[in-house]
């Protein structure tokens, strides 16, 4: 029988789920039994069950910053989710809750507070997301990735831990990655991903510039569910995937450059791998602007180049990729000087302290 029991939560996008997985090996070493609460049909269910972690589904309403008719009905879903979470927590009796944010986390955190179960949350981005803002009053500690984030957190709850990086991401195999893509030449490899849900804009721009890009690079393109273009299935040097999990460490090890959104979890993995990256953050029209702040921070440190969505026209993306290639050594040199490290150990220590305070 395990010494401790933890229930993790978080969902909506992979960025609210995969950091939880980064903690799992170390939690098991520390003798934690691990279970997970997510939404019934979110991306978290597939990711978590694939990793053989017991999963409980609850109802949850989306948290919106804009007017929508569903804003009138979703609070009732949240209340239902709190009731369902209370039932699960009463039965499971965890020692601590770890929340990675996303709208599914709010009912779980509130239920844990009602049951007086310690809650530790983690915020990846520079400014707290809406779910973590709502959850913060019910949390014992809120771990952050960026030092600048501490000023947004009240009552000395903030703890600077860094971003949890999955160990397997650092242990990919380049030869295996090239083999998966059937790349047999020595061209440099450009790895493109638009987040777990894909990016229509990035997909279109890459395909528009594909022939030019293929002169210099082989291309791995993670394009999102339902976004594989059948017109390019047999295009030499161009490999498309809807989404990858097990193959990701090998594909990232194989690549020389990355084009990506600027979610904090991902960019700290790119930094750990020392991969020169062109960051295309979600615009303020489609987000709260957190990715723009993340990308600006990395550009300022000299780790990445940045291209705003509004700047993408004509040949701008292609020219920016050529600049990325030209500045490869400079960017790698800057990343090698970085003091950033994985936050796994620091987060585990916060969880252990929370459990011991409870006991």
Curated annotation (Swiss-Prot):
Could you tell me which InterPro entries the record lists for this protein?
Answer: GlcNAc_MurG, Glyco_trans_28_C, GlycoTrans_28_N
Location comes to: Cell membrane
Do the record's keywords include Aminoacyl-tRNA synthetase?
A: no
Q: Where does UDP-N-acetyl-alpha-D-glucosamine bind?
A: 13-15, 166, 196, 291
Mind listing the UniProt keywords for this protein, alphabetically?
Answer: Cell cycle, Cell division, Cell membrane, Cell shape, Cell wall biogenesis/degradation, Glycosyltransferase, Membrane, Peptidoglycan synthesis, Transferase
User: Which family is this protein grouped under?
Assistant: Belongs to the glycosyltransferase 28 family. MurG subfamily.
User: What is the official name of this protein in its record?
Assistant: UDP-N-acetylglucosamine--N-acetylmuramyl-(pentapeptide) pyrophosphoryl-undecaprenol N-acetylglucosamine transferase
What is the native source organism of this protein?
Clostridium beijerinckii (strain ATCC 51743 / NCIMB 8052)
Task: Please state the span of the N-terminal signal peptide per the UniProt entry.
Answer: none
As for membrane topology, the entry says:
Peripheral membrane protein
| Entry keyword Membrane | yes
């Amino acid at each position: 029988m395990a010494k401790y029991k933890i229930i993790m939560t978080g969902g909506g996008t992979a960025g609210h789920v995969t950091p939880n997985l980064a903690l799992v090996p170390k939690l098991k070493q520390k003798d934690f039994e691990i279970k997970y609460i997510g939404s019934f049909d979110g991306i978290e269910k597939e990711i978590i069950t694939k990793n053989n972690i017991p999963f409980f589904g609850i109802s949850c309403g989306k948290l919106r910053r804009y007017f929508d008719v569903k804003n009138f009905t979703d609070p009732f879903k949240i209340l239902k989710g709190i009731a369902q979470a209370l039932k699960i927590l009463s039965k499971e009796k965890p020692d601590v809750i770890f929340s990675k944010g996303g709208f599914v986390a709010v009912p779980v955190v509130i239920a844990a507070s009602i049951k007086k179960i310690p809650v530790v949350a983690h915020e990846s981005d520079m400014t707290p997301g809406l779910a973590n803002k709502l959850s913060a009053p019910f949390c014992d500690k809120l771990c952050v990735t960026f030092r600048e984030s501490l000023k947004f957190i009240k009552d000395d709850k903030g703890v600077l831990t860094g971003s949890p990086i999955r160990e397997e991401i650092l242990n990919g195999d380049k030869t295996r990655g090239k083999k998966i893509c059937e790349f047999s030449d020595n061209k440099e490899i450009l790895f493109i991903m638009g987040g777990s849900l894909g990016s229509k804009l990035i997909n279109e721009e890459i395909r528009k510039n594909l022939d030019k890009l293929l002169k210099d690079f082989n291309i791995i393109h993670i394009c999102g569910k339902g976004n594989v273009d059948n017109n390019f299935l047999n295009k030499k040097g161009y490999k498309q995937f809807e989404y990858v999990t097990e193959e990701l460490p090998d594909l990232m090890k194989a690549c020389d450059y990355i084009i990506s959104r600027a979610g904090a979890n991902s960019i700290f993995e790119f930094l750990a791998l020392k991969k020169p990256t062109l960051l295309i953050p979600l615009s303020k029209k489609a987000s709260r602007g957190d990715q723009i702040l993340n990308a600006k921070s990395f550009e300022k440190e000299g780790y990445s180049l940045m291209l705003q969505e509004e700047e993408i026209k004509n040949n701008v993306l292609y020219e920016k990729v050529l600049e990325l290639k030209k500045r490869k050594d400079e960017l790698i040199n800057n990343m090698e000087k970085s003091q950033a490290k994985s936050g796994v150990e620091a987060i585990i220590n916060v969880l252990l302290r929370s459990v011991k305070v409870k006991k």
